Amino acid sequence: LAWAVENDYAGIEAMSGIPGSVGATPVQNVGGYGQEVSQVITQVEFLDQETGELAIKPAAFFEFSYRDSALKHGLLGIIGWVEFRLLKLDGLSVPMASGQITQHVGAAYGSQLPLSQIRDSVLELRSSKGMVVKANDPDSVSCGSFFTNPVVSYSKSLEFPEEMQRWSMPDEDQVKLSAGWLIENAGIPK
């Protein structure tokens, strides 16, 4: 990820700081801050456990959806490699699709910003939540988050306390709620 940003490749910059390896990304459809790998995966080398067939499969084969794929629902096998389609946008990001990032940097939803600014902002936000591994901080060790932030109607979002984090969505009648806030305020601290 750092290499992609340093070399002006856009499409994964908002996933900075997520722990793990490339081969695991299709399983969870890893993502964060408005980006997910299904947006940039073109094909995957896949060894089907059931048939023993080694084949290059298109992204559609994995039935990606929000933090989900067929690999979590019975499709078993080994991922050899993943091909990503990244974009060269003169050092700019893809249009930002995260209310958290746009609020953090003071930009409009859909803005294209310098890749390094997006990466730095994501790392800063993730660090503030204890979600970036730091050598001298044992509390930062994490395997990443496996929950999804719930999306509710705007009217439903008004039923939650005002101090709860929430972010606007492209559909103005929808609001993304902070799963982390909900979990911590249900009595399960970090």
Predicted regions mapped to residue ranges:
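Anion-binding (especially nucleotide phosphate/pyrophosphate-binding) glycine-rich loop
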Residues: 1-51
